[in-house]
Amino acid sequence: MARIKRGIMTHKRHKKLLNQAKGFRGSRSHNYKTAHEAVMKALAYAYRDRRNRKRDFRRLWIVRINAAARLNGLSYSNLINGLNKAGIVIDRRQLADLAVRDAAAFTAIVAQAKQALA
């Protein structure tokens, strides 16, 4: 039986990983072992932060809605309660976008929410 030498496959695997580590500083982009650790850590951070991004944006939208609602004399929780009672179905992303880009439309929505609360 012929002896199997895996030098070519190892070189390919190492090269692939070092390409993933492009842009990393120092030996983290040149040395296979440290590059491997850096890439694995980067992938773990990326996985974690893809989930955190959803939370972060929701928090940002809520902060923006709350700020705009308070300018119209209503707190965030009262606004959401009023929207539910008025039967207005609009997600926080769209509501925050309205608050930033179209203050008149946001004020009209807040007025309907206030009416439903009264």
Curated annotation (Swiss-Prot):
CC annotations in GO: ribonucleoprotein complex; ribosome
Keywords attached to this entry: Ribonucleoprotein, Ribosomal protein, RNA-binding, rRNA-binding
Keyword Cell division part of the UniProt annotation: no
Function: Binds directly to 23S ribosomal RNA and is necessary for the in vitro assembly process of the 50S ribosomal subunit. It is not involved in the protein synthesizing functions of that subunit.
A Pfam family per the record: Ribosomal_L20
Protein name according to UniProt: Large ribosomal subunit protein bL20
Coiled-coil portions: none
Highest rank taxon of the organism: Bacteria
CDD domains tied to this protein: Ribosomal_L20 (cd07026)
Encoding gene (name): rplT
Family: Belongs to the bacterial ribosomal protein bL20 family.
GO biological process, one term: ribosomal large subunit assembly
GO molecular function: rRNA binding; structural constituent of ribosome
Classification of source organism: Bacteria, Bacillati, Chloroflexota, Chloroflexia, Herpetosiphonales
